[in-house]
Amino acid sequence: MARVKTGVVRRRRHKKVLKLARGFFSARHKHFRKAKEQLERSLVYAYRDRRQKKRDFRRLWIVRINAACRLNDISYSRFINGLNKANIELDRKILADLAMNDAKAFAALAKQAKDALK
């Protein structure tokens, strides 16, 4: 029986890794071993940061809402508490968008939150 070598399989595997490593710096996009090491690391970063992104955006929304609340003479925590007591169910993404793009609507929400706290 003839000996089977890995020529085609190896070439395909190397091409796949090097294709995914496009844009990496220096040897990390040219040499298979370095590319493979960096690619494994990159996939770990990607996995981690897909989860981190959700936390980062929530923090950003809270900062924006807090800034708009302060302009309306109410703290963030009292604002959220007031909205809950007034049965206004808007998530932080929508509230942050209102705070940035529609100050009048946000001021009306802040007024409702203040009234609910009284």
Swiss-Prot record:
Where are its TM segments located? Answer: none
The cross-references to Gene3D superfamilies, in alphabetical order and at most eight, read: 6.10.160.10, Ribosomal protein L20
Cytoplasm found in the keyword field: no
Coiled-coil parts of chain? none
Q: Is Acetylation given among the entry's keywords?
A: no
Q: Which domain of life is it from?
A: Bacteria
Listed PANTHER family: 39S RIBOSOMAL PROTEIN L20
Q: What is this protein called?
A: Large ribosomal subunit protein bL20
